[in-house]
A protein has these predicted regions:
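Non-transmembrane catalytic domains and loops of membrane-associated enzymes and transporters
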Residues: 1-164, 168
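Alpha-helical bilayer-embedded segments of polytopic membrane proteins, i.e.
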Residues: 169-185
Length: 185
C-alpha cells in the first residue's frame, strides 16, 4: 500500500526513522503510525528539559499503552505516517472540519487521528521512529502552545468519546474503561 509521511518543518528525524515508522504498515489493519517525538534543545533551559520529561511520559508510557490496543489518540505532526487508503476518504471532512458549527483551525493531527480511529483502523506508536523538535524556552510561548494543544484535546476528547463507545464490543468493559481513561489523561 501507499504510505504518506509527515514531518514538521522544525523537526529533524533520525537516520532510520522512516524505515521504523513504516514497518507497522506490513499489517493491513494499521491506518496510521505515530513517531516518537523528542526535544532537540534541552540545553537551552529549564522549560525544554521539563518538556523532554513530559514527552517521555506521553510517548513512552501513554502512547505505548494506547498502541497496545491500536488506539493511539494523536499522530503528531512532527513525525507520523498514514496509509493513503485510510485517509483519502477523510480528506474533505478533515480539511473542512468544524466544531460546534465553527471552522476548526487547530489540532489537525488529533482530528485526522480521531477520524481514522472512527473508521476502525488501528493507530499505533513506533518508539524507534524518532524526531527531534525545538520547544519554547520562555513561559509566554510555552503557555500559548499548551493552550492551543489543550483546546484541541478538549474538542477531540469529546469527539472520541462517541468513537470509543462505538468501537469496542459491549462486553469488553476493560478495554472501554482503559480507553476512556487514556482520553482524559
Amino acid at each position: 500500500g501507499e504510505i504518506a509521511v509527515t514531518v514538521d518543518s522544525d523537526s529533524a528525524i533520525t537516520e532510520n526513522a522512516i524505515r521504523a515508522l513504516v514497518a507497522p504498515f506490513q499489517r493491513p489493519e494499521v491506518g496510521a503510525v505515530a513517531g516518537n517525538i523528542r526535544v532537540s534543545n534541552c540545553d537551552e533551559g529549564f522549560i525544554p528539559k521539563i518538556m523532554e520529561a513530559a514527552f517521555g511520559f506521553g510517548f513512552e508510557m501513554i502512547r505505548c499503552a494506547q498502541s497496545f490496543i491500536g488506539s493511539v489518540l494523536c499522530t503528531p505532526g512532527a513525525l507520523s505516517a498514514y496509509r493513503l487508503s485510510a485517509i483519502r476518504p477523510l480528506l474533505d471532512e478533515w480539511v473542512n472540519q468544524t466544531f460546534m458549527g465553527r471552522p476548526s483551525g487547530i489540532g489537525e493531527d488529533r482530528a485526522i487521528t480521531s477520524m481514522i480511529l472512527r473508521e476502525r483502523w488501528r493507530v499505533e506508536y513506533q518508539s524507534s521512529a524518532e524526531a527531534y523538535t525545538k520547544m519554547p524556552v520562555n513561559y509566554r510561548t510555552l503557555c500559548k502552545m499548551l493552550i492551543r494543544w489543550t483546546r484541541s484535546d478538549v474538542r477531540e476528547n469529546l469527539v472520541m468519546l462517541g468513537v470509543v463507545l462505538r468501537r469496542f464490543e459491549p462486553f469488553n468493559y476493560e478495554l472501554v474503561s482503559f480507553q476512556l481513561g487514556m482520553i482524559f489523561l
